[in-house]
């Protein structure tokens, strides 16, 4: 896991070297006629899809729906997706429900795009277009570089669809930022994680997918019940469960969500909740000197993954082989 985290910068650089192919796909899709975008993925790929959703909605102003593959596989109900943009994200490209959902979407008249690591896979075969992650083989059960790769590949596609030069510039800076992020030391979290009964990971907007991804890794690698949620949702029911044994990890982006996140962070501090904040002038977790809010949700995964891996080893767990899990998960 540790070595694969360190490979993330090169994975992303390799994706961006394929930019002409991504631009060609964007031109062939013809986004202007799409009534909506549907994003399909499970687990970590689903979290990458949440990040993609916010990019699509804020850059393309296109409403995004999260696909429920069981509508196709269990309920056998094909959806009305004519002219929709359907994006499926998968590391292995082999899960039967994702294959079926992609096949059904294409048959319904959607423009289907597969963001996959395994380009020779059933999901890739069913899609009209393929955007490769270029991550190479991943040996650890826990996905890291493929998650970062799928988020970067999705962002690159949106940048081309939108003709967004600012996003393209941020993506150009991303490999170097990922490389620098490997040196960030988040060890201040370790003690709280080791004694926690549960963990809440919160963010807003573009950071929500990463919050959910970090929570998944806490459950998967540290065997610690964790929930990733919107900082806005944290203020509803979940807030009642906060205590000295339920630390909150919060990610703050330097964008339109910053004011709300700052206010919530201050309130949690007053209530003596164990808060670990990344980003902003009040952030306790080491962060890069400058902000790139459109890609920071990707970069923040690097120090988060590293501290989870390190804490797992300190607790006597094998971060590369969590119990009862396999590298490829096939659902129906």
Set out the residue ranges of the language-model regions.
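Glycine-rich phosphate-binding loops that contact phosphosugars or nucleotide phosphates
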Residues: 21, 31-179, 204, 239-240, ...
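Short, well-ordered loop/turn and helix-capping segments at boundaries between secondary-structure elements
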Residues: 163, 224, 254, 270, ...
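Conserved phosphate/anionic-ligand binding catalytic regions in large, soluble enzymes, centered on
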Residues: 1, 51-52, 211-213, 217, ...
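Composition- and surface-driven signal marking solvent-exposed, interaction-prone regions
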Residues: 214, 262-264, 300, 323
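Peripheral docking tails and interdomain loops at the edges
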Residues: 290-332
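Active-site phosphate/pyrophosphate-binding segments
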Residues: 3-35, 129-247, 257, 315-332
């Amino acid at each position: 896991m540790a070595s694969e985290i360190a490979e993330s910068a090169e994975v992303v650089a390799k994706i961006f070297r394929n930019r002409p192919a991504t631009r060609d796909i964007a031109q062939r899709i013809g986004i202007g006629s799409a009534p909506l975008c549907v994003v399909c993925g499970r687990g970590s790929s689903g979290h990458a899809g949440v990040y993609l959703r916010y990019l699509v909605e804020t850059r393309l102003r296109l409403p995004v729906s999260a696909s429920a593959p069981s509508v196709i596989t269990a309920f056998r109900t094909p959806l009305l997706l004519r002219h929709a943009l359907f994006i499926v994200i998968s590391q292995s490209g082999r899960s039967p429900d994702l294959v079926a959902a992609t096949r059904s979407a294409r048959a319904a008249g959607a423009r289907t795009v597969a963001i996959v690591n395994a380009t020779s896979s059933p999901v890739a075969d069913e899609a009209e277009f393929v955007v490769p992650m270029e991550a190479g083989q991943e040996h650890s059960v826990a996905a890291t570089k493929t998650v970062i790769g799928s988020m970067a590949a999705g962002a690159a596609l949106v940048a081309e669809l939108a003709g967004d030069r600012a996003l393209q510039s941020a993506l150009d800076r991303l490999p170097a930022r990922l490389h620098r992020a490997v040196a960030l030391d988040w060890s201040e979290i370790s003690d709280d994680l080791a004694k926690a009964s549960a963990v809440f990971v919160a963010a807003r907007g573009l950071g929500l997918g990463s919050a959910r991804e970090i929570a998944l890794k806490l459950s998967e690698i540290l065997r610690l019940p964790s929930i990733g949620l919107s900082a806005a949702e944290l203020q509803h029911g979940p807030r009642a469960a906060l205590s000295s044994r339920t630390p909150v990890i919060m990610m703050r982006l330097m964008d339109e969500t910053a004011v709300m996140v700052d206010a919530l962070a201050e309130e949690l501090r007053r209530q003596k909740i164990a808060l670990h904040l990344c980003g902003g002038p009040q952030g306790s977790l080491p962060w890069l000197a400058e902000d790139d809010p459109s890609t920071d949700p990707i970069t923040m995964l690097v120090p988060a993954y590293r501290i989870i891996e390190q804490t797992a080893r300190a607790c006597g767990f094998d971060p590369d082989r969590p119990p009862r899990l396999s590298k490829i998960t096939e659902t129906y």
